[in-house]
Every structure is written in C-alpha cells, then in structure tokens.
C-alpha cells in the first residue's frame, strides 16, 4: 500500500507550514487567548454525527441514498467507500471527530491545529492574514513541491482540499472559524456521511472551563442537506503532553485500523 506522490506532498507541505508557524505562534501569542493553547482530545469520539436534537442530519434524497448505502456496506465489512482506510486524509470536520489528540497553537495572525493522526495540520487565517484577491475555485494541481511559505499566496490555498480554507476571528473569547473549499472525496464521519464541495462549516470554539473545549459546528451544503444544521463536541485538555507521531500506514502494518474510532 503506497501513498501517491501528490498525497505525500500535501502532507509534507501542511506539516512544513505548521512547523514554520510554531515559532511565530509562540512569539506572538495573545495572552487573552492563550488558554486555548495546548493538547486536546475528544471526550466521546463521533462515529455517526447527529444534530443537536440527536437526529440524523437532514439529507437530500440522493445524499440519503449514498449515506445509507455506506452504512449497509460497512455492516457487510466493505469500507472501500472510505478513502481514509488506505490513509487518505480524513479531512475536516472528521479530524475533529476521531479519537486522536491535536495541539492548538495561538498567534496574532494564525491559529494552528496540529493533529496527531498522520500529522495532518490545519491553519486558521485570522483577519489580515490573507489577501483579498480571490481566484476561481479549482481542484489542486500537484506540482511535486512540498515547501509552503508561512503566508502562502491566496491562489495557492484557495483550492479544494481535505482541510479546505479556514478563516477565523476572535469574538470576545470565542474563536469563530469558517471553512470552505472542502473536496468532496472525504466523508464527514466514519459512518459514511457524504458532502459536496459546496460544504461550508462554521465553528464556534469556546472554553467551558479551564480544561474543557467546546466546538459547535454549523453545516451548510444545499447539495447534500435540506437545511443548515448544527452539532457540538467537547474535548478535554491533556496537561503537559505533546502530540506524537501516528503514521497511518504503520497502524495498518500493525493490524490496527487506519482511523481509531
């Protein structure tokens, strides 16, 4: 089982960017938002996402057929519909749902989420961190280059990808993050909930206590859902810990599932 060159370049590029951000984040972190920094792990891993009312997401007919087919296939032991089983990125928001820790680093222009699973990273661009010029949407063209500047030009980041493009702002002590440009080859959860590349996520992250982080997520995707809907997940702090290497292919070789659910 091998990762394609393009996949390796994406992972390497994101990790390079997040690594470059570490120094900038620590050097310019905001004291008022510093409590968000640290390592977090989900309280209850989410296998099948439900609405705030505990119901199945409001799916369009075509999307519902795909979703229920995925559920039936998984019950039969067929997970070929889930590209994460061969170590493609689980993407956003699924990275926030799985049983894998992540580290948050706070800076004046960025917030970095560094995930232990296969070392994927997400950078949230705060106001002023991106130029205002927005090109047409496109799927990523793999150039073979893995280095990414600390502030990549917007034409390099506004392509469809597994973690999309995240813009954020602090509203008091709440981090509001809007993510779009999400490629439709990923799934929202491990049960197989699909989405289109029109998916828009709005996250409101806040501390419910010194060691409890809440992420309230709003889903908007008219091609997949009949209406916008929300869910909420919580995480607990892991004091004194750092994230470690968790290579998906190594997990598979050891007979473990690609994604710990």
Residue ranges: model-predicted function:
Residues 9-22:
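Bacterial N-terminal signal peptides
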Residues 1-7:
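N-terminal secretory signal peptides that target proteins for export/translocation
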Residues 23-261:
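PEST-like low-complexity, intrinsically disordered acidic/proline/serine-rich tracts
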